[in-house]
């Protein structure tokens, strides 16, 4: 009885919420054995056929490659890809790949040579002799990834499991309609699958190993039981057929009764799951030394005349496989990669087969049915009842349609496995899975942008911290360099400061003169006497001819005679019109001073200028000026009462006459006598004389003022002295 209860507990299974039972449509392809497909003339191998970054290229255009040769290097999650056959690399360029939008990805294009030669293979038949790390590295470098549809690198998955794994589950459910790749593989290669399971169990060392398979695969179940007849470490669990029981979280719950938490992974509860196709690839990589270069693909649908499962080389164009299966396309023919619920329609047939390709479905028009028009949601909750992940698809639909990313995330849209059960039962024909895929892609893009922004912020903060550290270090160096100078340096600095202060004190010391004493002006007097002696020496250096008293000058004699006559006439007129006045001593003194000044000036001019010959032109001009002045004086004397002689005016007129005479002498000495110029100058002189006569007749004459006469005399003396000094400077 105890053994019966133990056996019951051992084979116990659980159930999950939701799920559907669509038509299976598996009998079209699971009845024929696996077969090989002829090599395609050209292969397109995308560098990224897994979850993660693409590997680093290790081949170039023109290289000859063999089957199994690595085309890229794999580090971390970068999984390498290998050549599916021998041939020549003709291009490395972007090419459309297995994607709903047929996005272009970098690919290696190889022209097959038809020889299909392998690289040298080295298998580990005794894999137990190798360490766990060596086995994981070999699995990774041989390009093994999850072949159930996710494409996660198997080596990374095994490495991440570590010692936490207590249960290893082999997924053999294959629940989606039409797909029979795993079913046929278990029928034909059960022993190799079990050997691969043993390798995985050797790496992980779990407490139990479970194989979950649906009850709609009787031939596969019988083959596995035959292989596992003597095995006590591996349990085969047959579960009811229900879609999507092949999901990782759903199968985990069925076999263990444990639920994976929201946002978590199966490894969080000590469970690791692998596909039967992955177990077979592990066996070939470890034991046979063959990288993954091919996989089983189901070719099915009413548009295919020879449905079945084939060994398809990775990189083979879809068109080549369908043509080998007898593809008969209709006018509006569609081809689906994957199953009818979780697959996607290919935009064209030139895309290559990759590691996650498990089925190519080519249905007829009647098989798929007429397309249904999308209607509004009626809130019937049928989608929520069918959801195996316990989500609310109708709420996620509204959040996705309204771009409410935060609410969609809060309602666990990331836990959606995109099984399509909600869309299958929707009476409004709403393609819910398409909305959910788009929403998850947008959320991932937002998170990626936030991650980049956070990384940029971290780099900026690190840079600011580095700059602050450098600044602090720089200030510390400056402070350490600013030490006190040595004692001898301080002595030198103090001496220099003392000298500067002494000089400043001497410069600012005031001059003190004692009371009752006279200042010492001997230096100033000596300087003045030196200047006088220098001036006398310069005068003595002139030729004796310059200092000789010139003889009589007819020109000056004529001018003086004219002035004398004019003064005589003016005095006669004043004497005849006015009574005699007593002699004024002040006027006499002024006139005497004026006469002395004129005499000194004439002597200086005579001593500084050489005697020149008489110029008839200048003589005529001077005579005309003298006559004009005489007429002016006569008119003033005849029209106005006689006035006393004004010394100021006389001095000014005499100075003007002397200036004109000097100017005319200079001009006469530099130019030859020209009769025309002489006539012009005489005319100008007569015009000036007439103008002066007119002005004299129109302006009144003011009586003479003794004070003004004295001032005028003083001004005349100053002007005479200034003229004499200027003459000396000019001569020097």
Curated annotation (Swiss-Prot):
Binding-site residues for [4Fe-4S] cluster 1, renumbered to this chain: 377, 380, 383, 426
Keyword annotations: 4Fe-4S, Cell inner membrane, Cell membrane, Electron transport, Iron, Iron-sulfur, Membrane, Metal-binding, Repeat, Translocase, Transport
Protein name stated in the entry: Ion-translocating oxidoreductase complex subunit C
MF annotations from Gene Ontology: 4 iron, 4 sulfur cluster binding; electron transfer activity; metal ion binding
Chief location: membrane
SUPFAM superfamilies referenced in this protein's UniProt entry, alphabetically: alpha-helical ferredoxin, Nqo1 FMN-binding domain-like
Function of the molecule: Part of a membrane-bound complex that couples electron transfer with translocation of ions across the membrane. Required to maintain the reduced state of SoxR.
GO biological process: electron transport chain
UniProt organism field: Salmonella schwarzengrund (strain CVM19633)
Gene from which this protein is expressed: rsxC
Subcellular location: Cell inner membrane
Protein topology in the membrane: Peripheral membrane protein
Enzyme class, first EC level, given as a word: translocase
């Amino acid at each position: 009885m105890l053994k019966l209860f133990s056996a019951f507990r051992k084979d116990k299974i659980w159930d999950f919420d939701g799920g559907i039972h669509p038509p299976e449509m598996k009998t079209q392809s699971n009845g024929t054995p696996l077969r090989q497909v002829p090599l395609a003339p050209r292969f397109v191998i995308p560098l990224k056929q897994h979850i993660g970054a693409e590997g680093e290229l290790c081949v170039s255009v023109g290289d000859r490659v063999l089957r199994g040769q690595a085309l890229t290097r794999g580090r971390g999650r970068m999984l390498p890809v290998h050549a599916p056959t021998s041939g020549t690399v003709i291009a490395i360029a972007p090419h459309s790949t297995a994607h709903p939008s047929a996005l272009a990805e970098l690919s290696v294009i190889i022209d097959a040579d038809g020889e299909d030669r392998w690289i040298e293979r080295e298998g580990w038949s005794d894999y137990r002799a190798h360490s766990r790390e060596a086995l994981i590295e070999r699995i990774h470098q041989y390009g093994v990834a999850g072949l159930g549809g996710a494409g996660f690198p198997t080596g990374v998955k095994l490495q991440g499991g570590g010692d936490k794994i207590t249960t290893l589950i082999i997924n053999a459910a294959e629940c989606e309609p039409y797909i029979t790749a795993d079913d046929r593989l278990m029928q034909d290669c059960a022993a190799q699958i079990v050997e691969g399971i043993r390798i995985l169990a050797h790496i992980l060392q779990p407490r139990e190993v479970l194989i979950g398979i649906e009850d709609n695969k009787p031939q596969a179940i019988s083959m596995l039981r035959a292989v596992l007849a003597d095995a006590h470490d591996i349990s085969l669990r047959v579960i009811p057929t229900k879609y999507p029981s092949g999901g990782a979280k759903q199968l985990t719950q069925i076999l263990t009764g444990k639920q994976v938490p929201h946002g978590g992974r199966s490894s969080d509860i000590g469970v690791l799951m692998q596909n039967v196709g992955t177990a077979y690839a592990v066996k070939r990589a470890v034991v046979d030394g063959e990288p993954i270069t091919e996989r089983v693909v189901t070719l099915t649908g009413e548009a295919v005349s020879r449905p079945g499962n084939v060994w398809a080389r990775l990189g083979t164009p879809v068109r080549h496989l369908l043509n080998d299966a007898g593809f008969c396309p209709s006018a509006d023919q569609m081809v689906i990669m994957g199953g009818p619920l979780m697959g996607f329609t290919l935009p064209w047939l030139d895309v290559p087969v990759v590691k996650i390709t498990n089925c190519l479905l080519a249905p007829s028009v009647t098989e798929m049915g007429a397309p249904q028009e999308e209607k509004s949601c009626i809130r019937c909750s049928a989608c929520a009842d069918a959801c195996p992940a316990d989500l609310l698809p109708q709420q996620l639909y509204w959040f996705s349609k309204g771009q409410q990313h935060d609410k969609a995330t809060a309602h666990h849209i990331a836990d959606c496995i995109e099984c399509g059960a909600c869309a299958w039962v929707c009476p409004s024909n709403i393609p819910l899975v398409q909305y959910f895929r788009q929403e998850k892609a947008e959320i991932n893009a937002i998170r990626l942008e936030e991650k980049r922004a956070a990384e940029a912020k971290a780099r900026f903060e690190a840079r600011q911290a580095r700059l602050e550290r450098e600044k602090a270090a720089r200030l510390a160096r400056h402070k350490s360099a600013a030490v006190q100078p040595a004692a001898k340096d301080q002595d030198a600095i103090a001496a220099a400061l003392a000298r500067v202060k002494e000089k400043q004190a001497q410069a600012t010391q005031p001059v003190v003169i004692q009371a009752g004493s006279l200042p010492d002006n001997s230096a100033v007097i000596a300087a003045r006497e030196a200047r006088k002696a220098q001036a006398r020496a310069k005068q003595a250096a002139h030729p004796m001819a310059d200092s000789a008293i010139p003889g009589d000058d007819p020109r000056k004699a004529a001018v003086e005679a004219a002035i004398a006559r004019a003064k005589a006439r003016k005095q006669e007129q004043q004497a005849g019109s006015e009574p005699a006045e007593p002699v004024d001593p002040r006027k006499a003194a002024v006139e005497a001073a004026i006469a002395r000044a004129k005499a000194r000036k004439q002597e200086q001019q005579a001593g500084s200028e050489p005697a020149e010959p008489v110029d008839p032109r200048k003589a005529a001009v001077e005579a005309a000026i003298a006559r004009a002045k005489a007429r002016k004086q006569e008119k003033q004397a005849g029209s106005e009462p006689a006035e006393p002689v004004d010394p100021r005016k006389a001095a000014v007129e005499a100075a003007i006459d002397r200036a004109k005479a000097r100017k005319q002498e200079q001009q006469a000495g530099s130019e030859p006598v020209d009769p025309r110029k002489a006539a012009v100058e005489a005319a100008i002189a007569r015009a000036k004389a007439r103008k002066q006569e007119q002005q004299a007749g129109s302006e009144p004459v003011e009586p003479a003022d003794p004070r003004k006469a004295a001032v005028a005399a003083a001004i005349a003396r100053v002007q005479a002295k200034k003229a004499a000094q200027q003459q000396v400077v000019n001569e020097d």
